[in-house]
Amino acid sequence: MTVFADILDTVRRHEPVVHCITNYVTVNDCANMVLAAGGSPIMADDAAEVEDIVALSQALVINIGTLNSRTVESMLVAGRRANSMGKPVVLDPVGAGASALRNSTLQRLLGEVRFAAIKGNASEIGFLAGKDAKARGVDAQDSCLVTEDRLESAAATARHLSESTGAVVVVSGAIDIVAYSGGAWAVRNGHPLMARITGSGCMSAAVMGCCLGVAPYEMPQACLCAVSALGVAGEIAAETMVGGGGEMGGLGGGTGSYRALLLDAMSLLDGLALGSRADVTRIQM
């Protein structure tokens, strides 16, 4: 996994500016995760300034978690500006399929902005791919969760969406999938506690912004690096909390402690550790 180590170390060296137009539930988590990954976050969301902010940034992350008419316009303006400047744009279609506003907003975004990557849970990706998937709030339906038995079908759905949009498609879950027209990969890093804190998916998109910001011409590799890095950090955080030999010893605690330890683990993660722990395999289709 040398390429992942190289990308993560490049993020640390170059500190890419990542512009996030995200939801107010996890905006602080995303900003801190960008910092932990080695980037520099800016969370501006007013349409009057987003073009200027995009010009200063290396990547743009759009998250529709808490939509309103003001931020929808900001997303469109920022996305078009990023496209005109050749800067990668990440879409996190939170709650796709849950409401008419989300669906119409996604239709506009996908029609007017070219995305380097689209990251969502299995229900969200299934909805965008035209499958019969419905949202359960911002979480995936149980019938859509990615398991070993459903891995190939989920990968095929992700690849279909990639081919129709030109974006690398990431399906988040217990097993993560990264797909594009050239193939699909399974990432088996992470820990169940990641699903017990709000914002872990949003943080993943933010880390993708960091990696794409330094490797815009290696989009699949950048997305794989981001997904595996956050997963490895999640594993280390759990090991640290329960006393399995983490750097800080066994601290105990619950989900609040885990959230902080996840940031700690990402901030301490280096390319060597990522390369040795990343569990990425190609999905045969």
From Swiss-Prot:
E.C. no: 2.7.1.50
Underlying gene: thiM
InterPro entries xrefs: Hyethyz_kinase, Ribokinase-like
Protein name: Hydroxyethylthiazole kinase
Annotated substrate binding sites: 43, 199
UniProt GO molecular function: ATP binding; hydroxyethylthiazole kinase activity; magnesium ion binding
Lineage: Bacteria, Pseudomonadati, Thermodesulfobacteriota, Desulfovibrionia, Desulfovibrionales
Pfam families referenced in this protein's UniProt entry, alphabetically: HK
Function statement: Catalyzes the phosphorylation of the hydroxyl group of 4-methyl-5-beta-hydroxyethylthiazole (THZ).
Family: Belongs to the Thz kinase family.
Pathway: Cofactor biosynthesis; thiamine diphosphate biosynthesis; 4-methyl-5-(2-phosphoethyl)-thiazole from 5-(2-hydroxyethyl)-4-methylthiazole: step 1/1
Top-level taxon of origin: Bacteria
Organism: Desulfovibrio desulfuricans (strain ATCC 27774 / DSM 6949 / MB)
NCBIfam families registered for this protein in UniProt: PRK09355.1 (NF006830)
Keyword terms of this UniProt record: ATP-binding, Kinase, Magnesium, Metal-binding, Nucleotide-binding, Thiamine biosynthesis, Transferase
Record-annotated membrane-spanning stretches: none
